């Protein structure tokens, strides 16, 4: 309930606002806001800086993913995946003030990710981002469908799915649930990040902004539910196999 309330009261309205501004003023977030009123241009730089900071740690996580993709062929993590991740892969030190050595696989992974990003951006919107999205988005959806189908066939998957789809009405009155719901909507739709405003600046002149906002929000919502089914089915399997409650 809080999630859907957040979608209709914040997600879709703010998408319409950002799409509308980007479509009308034809520019990045700082430029679009500057074209409305020059003295408010600085507001547009806040989400731009935030997006750059997020990109920094996203690149790190993607580097981990690239490395683990190569590890998966030989199951390099062995029997103790936690110890491998923290000690062998990350090579964590005992204190934040204790500097360790350079972890070259992670650095090379980051360089690889940035090189791909640079190439896509260099090719522009139509030749880069659009072409990449036409390949990567269907691939992502296909992979998630395969994972979800496999997950629901696992022993104990129904335990996880029952947890997902059985409402706990006592949680509705807790503020933290509403904060989490709105946070999820803002994060997953990239609201107030400047991304949607910049993308919409490339839309054709006669684009139906309202329809685009609804389609984006509902498509995102559908993918999140597909992901939730896969995750909770796997959690149910893990809880059953370890004879634990799913909440643990």
Give the ranges of each region predicted by the language model.
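Hydrophobic transmembrane alpha-helical segments of multi-pass transport and channel proteins
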Residues: 8-12, 16-17, 57, 221-226
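Short helix-coil transition sites and intra-membrane helix breaks within transmembrane domains
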Residues: 11, 22-24, 55-60, 185-192
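Juxtamembrane transmembrane-helix boundary signature
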Residues: 2-38, 234, 238
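Inter-helical loop and helix-membrane interface segments of multi-pass membrane transporters/permeases
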Residues: 27-46, 61-122, 126-128, 158-179, ...
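Membrane-interface alpha-helices at helix entry/exit sites of multi-pass transporters
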Residues: 1-2, 35, 42-46, 207-216
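Membrane-embedded translocation segments of transport machinery
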Residues: 130, 134-248
């Amino acid at each position: 309930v809080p999630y859907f309330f957040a979608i209709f009261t914040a997600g879709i309205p703010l998408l319409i606002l950002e799409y509308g501004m980007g479509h009308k003023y034809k520019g990045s977030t700082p430029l679009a806001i500057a074209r409305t009123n020059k003295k408010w241009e600085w507001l547009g730089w806040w989400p731009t800086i935030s997006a750059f900071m997020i990109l920094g740690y996203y690149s790190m996580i993607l580097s981990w993913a690239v490395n683990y993709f190569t590890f998966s062929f030989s199951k390099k993590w062995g029997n103790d995946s936690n110890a491998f991740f923290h000690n062998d892969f990350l090579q964590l030190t005992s204190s934040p003030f204790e500097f360790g050595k350079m972890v070259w696989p992670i650095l090379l992974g980051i360089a690889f990710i940035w090189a791909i990003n640079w190439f896509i951006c260099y090719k522009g919107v139509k030749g880069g981002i659009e072409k990449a999205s036409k390949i990567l988005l269907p691939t992502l959806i296909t992979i998630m469908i395969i994972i979800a189908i496999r997950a629901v066939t696992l022993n104990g998957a129904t335990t996880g799915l029952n947890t997902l789809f059985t409402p706990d009405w006592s949680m509705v009155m807790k503020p933290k649930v509403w904060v989490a719901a709105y946070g999820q909507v803002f994060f997953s739709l990239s609201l107030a990040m400047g991304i949607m405003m910049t993308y919409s600046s490339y839309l054709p002149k006669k684009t139906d902004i309202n329809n685009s906002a609804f389609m984006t929000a509902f498509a995102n919502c559908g993918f999140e539910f597909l992901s939730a089914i896969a995750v909770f089915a796997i959690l149910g399997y893990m809880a059953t196999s370890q004879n634990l409650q799913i909440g643990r």
